[in-house]
């Protein structure tokens, strides 16, 4: 689960906090060991996991244990410049039943994969700053657009991230001849530039030698378009309604299967 969540956006290269809903085992700790991270919070840790995590950041890695039985207050309070705001805590229950409440298209069937991905998208949105849109596929979030002033900007931002997620799986990208011992953040950042229109920034003479053993061929715009045209089976969630059809049109370009109603709102 951690690997899938991390893979949603590899450009979080220089620090994050990891939140786990279950005990951190040694396998998760070893995955985390090689990533740049500022801390982890979880209900418990195995002894083996603790030994691994204690080696991060020369022993200064933040490891926080939470009470899994803690129940927060139903009313939240926030103070802003001396003014106190109160609001009910978001206790929305996201489950399969809510997906089946109001299917408006002729096709009323959702595959098990679609249900899983829609639930993942909606759970992600529950804890994401509004306005927000999430694309999901294969049991993981692949693009999140958050905190935008308009819904279409959320859809575009999340769609662009989903496209990048898929482009990272292009055969040319998977076979890039990186130099030995390249740092993981450098590799991720190099891939991000390579698949963009600014690929010359990493392929120019005198530059590519820093990252590659041999100079790769660029991933052309035509190749990217052809690859993205095969992108399908994506689910999409939104934390509010779509006011205009432009959101639907943009989502479709990133593989959202509208015929299966892969769009949901909590």
For the regions a protein language model found, what residue spans apply to each?
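ATP-dependent carboxylate/acyl-activation modules
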Residues: 1-258, 264
């Amino acid at each position: 689960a951690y690997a899938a969540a991390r893979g949603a956006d590899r450009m979080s290269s220089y620090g994050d906090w990891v939140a786990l809903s279950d005990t951190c085992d040694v396998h998760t700790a070893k995955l985390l060991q090689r990533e740049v991270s500022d801390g982890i919070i979880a209900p418990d840790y195995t002894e083996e996991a603790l030994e691994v995590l204690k080696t991060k950041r020369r022993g200064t890695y933040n490891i926080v244990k939470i009470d899994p039985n803690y129940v927060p207050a139903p009313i939240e309070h926030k103070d802003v410049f001396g003014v106190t705001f109160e609001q009910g805590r978001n206790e929305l229950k996201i489950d399969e039943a809510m997906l089946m409440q109001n299917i408006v298209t002729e096709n009323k069937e959702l595959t098990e994969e679609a249900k899983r991905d829609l639930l993942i998208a909606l759970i992600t949105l529950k804890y994401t700053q509004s306005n927000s849109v999430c694309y999901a596929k294969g049991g993981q979030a692949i693009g999140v657009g958050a905190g935008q002033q308009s819904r279409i900007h959320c859809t575009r931002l999340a769609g662009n991230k989903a496209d990048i997620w898929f482009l990272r799986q292009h055969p040319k990208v998977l076979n890039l001849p990186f130099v030995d011992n390249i740092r993981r953040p450098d590799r991720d950042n190099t891939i991000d530039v390579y698949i963009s229109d600014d690929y010359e920034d990493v392929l120019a003479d005198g530059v590519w030698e820093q990252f590659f053993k041999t100079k790769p061929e660029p991933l052309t715009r035509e190749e990217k378009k052809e690859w993205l045209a095969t992108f399908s089976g994506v689910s999409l969630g939104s934390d509010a309604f779509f006011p205009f059809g432009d959101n639907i049109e943009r989502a479709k370009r990133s593989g959202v299967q509208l015929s299966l109603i892969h769009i949901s709102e909590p």
